[in-house]
């Protein structure tokens, strides 16, 4: 594997991490709030 390819894969991984973690945290937070409001 070339260094540019590994850097590309690395940036893809970090991009996924940076996007997915806040998104799932927000979804969890919203679903928890929604559950409280409905009951």
Swiss-Prot record:
Pfam families: PsbX. Gene3D superfamilies: Single helix bin. The keyword Iron-sulfur does not apply. The chain crosses the membrane at residues 11-31. It is a single-pass membrane protein. Keywords: Cyanelle, Membrane, Photosynthesis, Photosystem II, Plastid, Thylakoid, Transmembrane, Transmembrane helix. Involved in the binding and/or turnover of quinones at the Q(B) site of photosystem II (PSII). PSII is a light-driven water plastoquinone oxidoreductase, using light energy to abstract electrons from H(2)O, generating a proton gradient subsequently used for ATP formation. This is Photosystem II reaction center protein X. It comes from Cyanophora paradoxa. The lineage of its organism: Eukaryota, Glaucocystophyceae, Cyanophoraceae, Cyanophora.
